[in-house]
């Protein structure tokens, strides 16, 4: 109400004006459950007209709406009427449907949202190949398209698509998909050729990777140098054999941790891969890498005559171990820091990347094959929020196991995961999400169990079954964060803890 009162001494009576306000009802959100829809603009309560592209394989739309008023004072109606909660597209008038929100009392105050439907042609496509165990991926731009039942893709006639077919022992093939290229069964046959035969060196490897063996246990019988220390002068009779300034600084320009293969020591510094004589420190051979590493922390990995290095921006590069000729470079589409050790198993390369505490990053499987070209495609990829940092994988003859970051800042979230994959297909065999803080250690293996630590300050162990399932969880609160890979030896476990 508004009351008008005459001034003191004035004439006239007090006047009261009464206003009745009616809030214009509007929708707050509108979504549809069907996939493959494209709306011209994002929904906004004040925008009343929209264009919606709908694949012709979709026969009805399933709307979910919310209103700005939530006290039951409004009604929502559809034209045409809903049938089993769906808007029937065969009953549209002039290709349009409306959603009306009105006051529940009279229905006189209302807002009408109009959607114009544009039907888009679709077709089914399936890619077949001669390569056993091949992985097929289809992209629309940079977006991965998910296949339906039996590997059949539902594609749109107004979009362009490309395929990638990768298989162990074969040269990767990429190309475009179009409806005219399919046979009568709706299939596109992609024939892969065998990788070219090359002769690689066969070296014995004393210490081929970060942890020295496939179990990531870092156990050795080699003795450290010994000598006498003079108590008065504090001098030692142990002599420095050699020192080589192969790098500079303390970041990616520094010399990384070495591996020992075929009587040589391999390391990298800056953008150079180095092959060194361990007796003299002399550089026997060197090669340019595609970039430098992120922090020169993780050593290279050797296997089957090849040296593998993890580099900046989500890269992995492979070299011949004898003359350091580059064989191929992988570039991950999500990029990221390459701070995790590379795991090699049966001709497959596994490594993860990191894009910040909550950023999405990939764990990838690559075939080690030289394909006659420098570019390498992943056999399969797994994306995780928080990614992989210092997280080396364990692989056996069937499975590969890796730990993830928790996807959040701090060290108290119980959202870090231990994931078991089929090592060849990338299918998730088992996964647990109950670990406190980032898992930033290698996954170590001994006697049927995997061992790892977390930044939340725990030492964990799980049984890894022959079927790839995890069970028999055990944990110990260490009292401080840990990124140390455990060692299990002679009935005891050894692990480092932050002070």
Model features per residue range: what roles?
Residues 1-124, 130-132, 168-176, 182, ...:
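Beta-rich interaction/scaffold domains
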Residues 38-51, 140-148, 217-240:
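Short, polar loop/linker segments at the starts of domains and inter-domain junctions
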Residues 203-211, 249-273, 291-317, 334-364, ...:
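Repeat-blade elements of multi-bladed beta-propeller folds
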Residues 119-197:
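Short loop/turn and low-complexity linker motifs enriched in small/turn-promoting residues
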Residues 26-28, 83-85, 113, 121-123, ...:
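Cysteine-rich, disulfide-stabilized extracellular repeat modules
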Residues 33, 102, 137-139, 276, ...:
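Core beta-strand residues in small-molecule sensory/regulatory alpha/beta domains
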């Amino acid at each position: 109400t508004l009351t008008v009162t005459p001034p003191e001494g004035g004439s006239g009576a007090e006047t009261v004006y009464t206003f009745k306000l009616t809030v214009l009802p509007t929708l707050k959100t509108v979504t549809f459950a069907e996939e493959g829809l494209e709306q011209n603009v994002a929904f906004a309560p004040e925008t009343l007209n929209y264009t919606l592209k709908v694949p012709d394989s979709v026969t009805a739309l399933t709307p979910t709406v919310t209103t700005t008023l939530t006290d039951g004072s409004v009604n929502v109606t559809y034209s045409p009427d809903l049938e089993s909660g769906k808007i029937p597209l065969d009953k549209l008038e002039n290709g349009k449907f409306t959603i009306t929100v009105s006051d529940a009392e009279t229905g006189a105050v209302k807002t009408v949202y109009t959607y114009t439907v544009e039907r888009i042609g679709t077709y089914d496509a399936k890619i077949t190949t001669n390569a056993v165990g091949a992985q097929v991926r289809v992209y629309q731009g940079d977006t991965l398209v998910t296949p339906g039942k039996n590997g059949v893709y539902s594609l749109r006639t107004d979009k362009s698509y490309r395929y990638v077919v990768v298989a162990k022992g074969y040269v990767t093939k990429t190309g475009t998909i179009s409806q005219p290229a399919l046979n009568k069964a709706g299939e596109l046959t992609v024939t892969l050729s065998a990788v070219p035969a090359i002769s690689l060196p066969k070296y014995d490897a004393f210490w081929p990777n970060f942890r020295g063996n496939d179990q990531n246990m870092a156990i050795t019988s080699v003795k450290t140098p010994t000598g006498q220390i003079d108590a008065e002068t504090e001098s030692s009779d142990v002599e420095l054999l050699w020192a080589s300034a192969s790098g500079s600084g303390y970041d990616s320009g520094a010399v990384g941790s070495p591996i020992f293969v075929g009587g040589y020591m391999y390391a990298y510094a800056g953008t150079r891969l180095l092959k060194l004589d361990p007796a003299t420190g002399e550089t026997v051979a060197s090669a340019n890498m595609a970039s430098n590493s992120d922090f020169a922390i993780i050593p290279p990995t050797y296997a089957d005559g090849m040296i593998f290095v993890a580099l900046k921006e989500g890269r992995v590069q492979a070299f011949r171990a004898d003359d350091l000729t580059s064989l191929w470079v992988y570039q991950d589409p999500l990029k990221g820091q390459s701070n995790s050790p590379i795991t090699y198993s049966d001709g497959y390369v596994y490594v993860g990347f990191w894009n910040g505490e909550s950023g999405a990053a990939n764990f990838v499987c690559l075939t080690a094959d030289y394909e006659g070209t420098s570019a390498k495609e992943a056999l399969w990829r797994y994306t995780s929020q928080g990614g992989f940092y210092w997280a080396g994988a364990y692989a056996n003859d069937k499975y590969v196991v890796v730990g993830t970051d928790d996807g959040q800042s701090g060290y108290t979230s119980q959202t870090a995961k231990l994931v078991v994959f089929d090592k060849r297909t990338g299918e998730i065999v088992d996964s647990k999400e109950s670990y406190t803080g980032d898992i930033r250690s290698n996954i170590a293996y001994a006697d049927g169990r995997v061992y790892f630590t977390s930044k939340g300050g725990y030492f964990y162990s799980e049984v890894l079954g022959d079927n790839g399932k995890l069970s028999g969880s055990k944990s110990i609160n260490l009292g401080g964060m840990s990124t140390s890979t455990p060692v299990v030896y002679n009935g005891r476990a050894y692990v480092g803890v932050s002070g």
